[in-house]
Every structure is written in C-alpha cells, then in structure tokens.
Amino acid sequence: MSGIDIHGDEVRASGVTVKLTNTGKVLFPADNITKGELIEYYGHVAGWMLPYLRDRPIAMARFPDGIAHQRIFQKNPADYFPDWVRRVEVKKQGGTLRHVVCDKAATLVYLANQACIEFHVFLSQVGSLECPDQVVVDFDPAGPDDFDAARRCALWLRDLLTGELNLTCYVKTTGGKGLHVHLPLNRHEDFEEARGFARDAANVLVARHPSVVTTEQRKDGRGGRVYADIMRDSYAQTVVAPYSVRARPGAHVATPLHWEEAADPGLTPARFTLRTLGERLAGTPDPWAGMSRHRYDVATARRRLAGLS
C-alpha cells in the first residue's frame, strides 16, 4: 500500500491510526470483493488519486451492505467522523452545507472503511468554489454495448479542442458505460460561462455528427445516440473522481487514459478494475500528470471556438 502501513485491524497513514472494522464483509457479491480488499485498493492508489481529490468537496456513495443493497449518497460528514477528517462549508440556497474534503491517505482509507465505494468531486476547489478549474463533457451512450460510440465522440472532441483550438484536454473512462473529457481552466470565470463553452463545443459535435451524438436531455428524444452531457458543469455538482471504484459488478474503475489508449477500438470499461489497476499503475505513468500545466480561460476558448464558424 502506498505510504500506508496495515497491521491486522489497523492502518497507519498520514500520521494517524485508522481502525478497520468488518473487513471480511463482501461488498461485490458476484466478484467476492470484500471491504478489506476495497480498503487495500484505496490505500494502494492514494498517491495517484489524492491530487484529484485535494481541496475539493466530495460526495460519498456508501454501500454498508454491499452493492446489491441500498446506496447512501452522502455529502455531509457524520457526527462520528474523527476531527482529522477535513470539513468545509459550501454555500447553498438558504444557507450552507458541510462537505468532506479528502486530502490525505488516512481520510481515503477511513472513508473506504465506511464502505464508501465511489468518490464524487466538485469541479472547483476550496477558496474559489464558484469558479471551476475544469469543465467536463460526459459522453453517455444509449446502452452498455455502445461504449465504442462514446469513445469516438471523445476523440472527436479531442480533435476539436486540441487539434483545432490548441487546448490540451484529458480523458477518462467513467467506470460505467461512457467517458469524460476534461478541459482544465484557470478559475477566472463562473460555472455559467464554463458550461456555455461546453455547450458550444458539444453543439459543434452534434452539427458534425448528428446521427451519433446529441445534446437532447430527454432519453426518449435521443434516438439511440450518445448523449453529450454538460450539466455536471454547474455549481456544487459532482463528477466521479479519477481512480474511484464504481459500485457495479466487476468493480470497474474510473481511469485516466492516454489519448492513444482512447483511440484503441478494443477499449472497454471492463479493462480497468479494482483488481487490475495496480498492475497498470506500476507500468503506466499517470496520463493526467501534466494537467496543472495547462490552464485556460473560458473567454479565450470561446473566442477560438467562435472563430471556426
């Protein structure tokens, strides 16, 4: 485990001791994956995952009885969470809501011990929550067998953003049936501006590939096409975090990719799982490692996009 020492029912991480409970509990029945194995996974990937969690309020998808049972989608910390778990107040209509910020390995392990399988993060950071540092387009195919169509849409968006607008963007599998394309921003504009750019870019794809991709929100209006979803680009909304496990049979993982990997027609979501990702990380540098070097302002991006017409 990366920077973490595990001894029986205790883990030592980030200078604190996390007591583990009921590690033999099976969370993924079809795969016989236990809570202990989930904890081991998050301990192992902490060094890769934490940079994408740090300073971001999170939402937790917890499954105390396993994925076949009720999900607890939790934003606020429970009263019993230890003091060293960071909290932050997030403004909302009529007041504030307290969120957890997972900024150290001990918190990651502690939440895994709470049967938190999925980690979902804000697209903005503490100190500037109203201004995103990323914009994301979620390519959501009509069905689980349509992943390749979503893959092609992600490549088309890369060609638009990077090839035509000279904006470096990043891609990950969602761990579900689609992919996310992220564009890093410099936090100068609010979510409305960022979402406007995402909408404009998605509309270009629809104009170029109308039989494959749509921005129609109603499922019955999509006609089997890939949905280019930009609604996550809103204040206090979340997206699944890089390297998060998904609460689905197979324990697929939301995995950052090199664009060369996304270009592989044989790519499937099942390639990256809780049990296989360790080998990948041992041999593949983090595809998103350079993201902090590429930050764009939305106004410039929109001007470049408008210049195409």
Model-identified regions with their sequence ranges:
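Charge-rich, low-complexity segments
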Residues: 1-112
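Short beta-strand
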Residues: 61-63, 169-175, 216-220
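A short beta-strand motif that forms the metal-chelation/ATP-contact edge
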Residues: 180-186, 227-230
